């Protein structure tokens, strides 16, 4: 979607002054995330028969970096601690693994993990709340609607249009997305504004038409059946929550938006692709070659009278190359020689590894996040040289994500109580329990917990729960059975054999 063209349309028709130039930078980050930047990955080759194009091979490291950050920050071991039991059950379900409740219906954890990846390539991510099946009065005020359904959208920066920003916090925003209406492309715009304690969510649709200039044109479309143009709620928190990588932006423009986690590592990403492409080309062109004289070959003539030489081995034709006939007497033997190009694997490996180390360092993952030694990948839990850098950066990046998570959960609880008439408490305490296995591996943690349990520093049921994935009740039962068995053995052996 051409977001810049749509922003220009909104600026003209609504009197806004949204900076469209910043979205060109977001588009450049998107290209790197997808692994194809035309100015970098298109190679022109000039031959005797004209110009040819070749696409440079890419490791697509920007996407891998964003995936790794998402897996570190928001994964299956991330949990919520909610003070009110009814609110916790409503959101998370009644089991200790937090695999039920509304968040399961919304596929929250899977989508939130993907949103972190999207936010880290685009610079900003947004959780956006909406409620379907609402009842509204003639003025558009939302009324209690037990039949309503809470929904969440997950938008990257290219879909976020900040309208009001106060002290670096986006208080009003619009969210744009592509859709299809009547089989034709369209744009859906949802605008969140606040005035005097009232929040208004406005829904608009626009038709997209092609123009001879190549720039799309937009026209206001009718509201689809079953949809309202706007709703108003009073006393609600913001129905959206934004977060960005925890770095200070050194790029002008885009107020309210962050910058990509790899925006300062584009040169390193380019170096990685250059090194990898060179490695690949050396392997592709490094096959055995045999140069021979045409006089060594059988000849055949096609229907046009053109003579062709049959190479010594037609099956492996690609290794044979013709040489000009040798000068001298006709009795001189035919010339041929074998050539085995140097693949330069060590040099190429070192170049790729250096580029990966620079990329890892510039993206805050430490110096050796991606280390290939003896054919084995050494991950973050297998090296200690720069783990401290990763720990510090991960702790810093948890802060904005935690703020966004708590903000959207409070908005969900508010809508559940005031609109869906659910028995929940929007003001309950909420905290996030982060997975810190990137600091200490699960095996190391379990081994340490076992030693502490044997030393009597922690209850043995705590170790059993961590080691075997038991619930608290099951762990207590196992510990009691183990204690009873040990006492029985002592009684049986009391007094000797």
Question: What residue ranges belong to the model's regions?
Answer:
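Activation/maturation switch segments at domain boundaries
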Residues: 448-497
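Charge-rich, acidic-biased intrinsically disordered regions
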Residues: 27, 44, 50, 132, ...
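Extended, charged amphipathic alpha-helical segments
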Residues: 223-385
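Extended, regular secondary-structure scaffolds
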Residues: 121, 126-259
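Short coil/turn segments at secondary-structure boundaries
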Residues: 115-116, 129-130, 283-291, 369-374, ...
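Surface-exposed loop-to-helix/strand elements on domain peripheries
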Residues: 90-93, 98, 300, 324-444, ...
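Extended, helix-rich architectural segments
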Residues: 1-171, 494-497
């Amino acid at each position: 979607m051409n977001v810049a063209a749509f922003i220009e349309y909104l600026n003209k028709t609504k009197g806004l002054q949204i900076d469209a130039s910043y979205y060109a930078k977001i588009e450049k980050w998107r290209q790197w995330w997808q692994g194809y930047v035309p100015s970098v990955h298109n190679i022109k080759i000039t031959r005797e028969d004209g110009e040819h194009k070749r696409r440079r091979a890419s490791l697509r490291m920007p996407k891998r970096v964003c995936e790794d950050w998402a897996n570190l920050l928001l994964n299956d071991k991330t949990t919520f601690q909610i003070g009110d039991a009814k609110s916790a059950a409503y959101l998370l379900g009644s089991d200790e693994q937090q695999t039920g409740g509304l968040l399961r219906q919304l596929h929250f954890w899977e989508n939130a993990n993907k949103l972190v990846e999207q936010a880290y390539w685009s610079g900003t991510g947004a959780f956006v709340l909406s409620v379907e099946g609402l009842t509204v009065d003639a003025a558009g005020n939302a009324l209690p609607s037990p039949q309503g359904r809470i929904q969440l959208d997950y938008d990257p920066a290219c879909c976020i249009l900040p309208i009001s920003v106060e002290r670096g916090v986006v208080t009003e925003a619009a969210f744009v997305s592509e859709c299809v209406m009547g089989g034709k492309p369209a744009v859906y715009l949802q605008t969140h504004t606040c005035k005097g304690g009232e929040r208004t969510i406005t829904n608009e649709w626009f038709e997209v038409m092609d123009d001879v200039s190549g720039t799309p044109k937009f026209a206001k479309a009718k509201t689809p059946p079953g949809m309202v143009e706007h709703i108003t709620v009073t006393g609600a928190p913001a129905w959206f929550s934004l977060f960005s990588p925890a770095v200070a932006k050194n790029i002008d423009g885009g107020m309210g938006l962050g910058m990509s986690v790899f925006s300062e590592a584009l040169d390193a990403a380019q170096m990685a692709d250059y090194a990898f492409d060179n490695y690949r080309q050396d392997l592709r062109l490094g096959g055995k070659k045999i140069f021979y004289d045409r006089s060594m070959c059988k000849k055949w003539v096609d229907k046009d009278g053109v003579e062709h030489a049959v190479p010594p081995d037609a099956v492996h034709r690609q290794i044979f190359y013709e040489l000009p006939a040798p000068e001298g007497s006709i009795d001189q033997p035919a010339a041929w020689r074998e050539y085995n190009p140097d693949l330069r694997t060590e040099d190429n490996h070192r170049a790729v590894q250096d580029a990966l180390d620079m990329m890892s360092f510039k993206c805050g993952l430490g110096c050796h996040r991606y280390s290939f030694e003896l054919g084995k990948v050494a991950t973050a839990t297998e090296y200690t040289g720069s783990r401290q850098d990763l720990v510090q950066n991960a702790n810093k990046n948890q802060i904005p994500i935690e703020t966004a998570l708590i903000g959207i959960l409070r908005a969900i609880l508010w809508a559940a109580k005031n609109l869906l008439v659910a028995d929940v408490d929007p003001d309950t305490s909420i905290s996030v329990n982060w997975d810190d296995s990137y600091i200490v591996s699960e095996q190391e943690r379990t081994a340490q917990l076992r030693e502490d349990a044997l030393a009597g520093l922690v209850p043995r049921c705590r170790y059993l729960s961590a080691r075997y994935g038991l619930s608290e009740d099951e762990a207590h039962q196992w510990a009691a059975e183990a204690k009873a068995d040990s006492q029985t053995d002592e009684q049986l052996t009391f007094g000797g054999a």
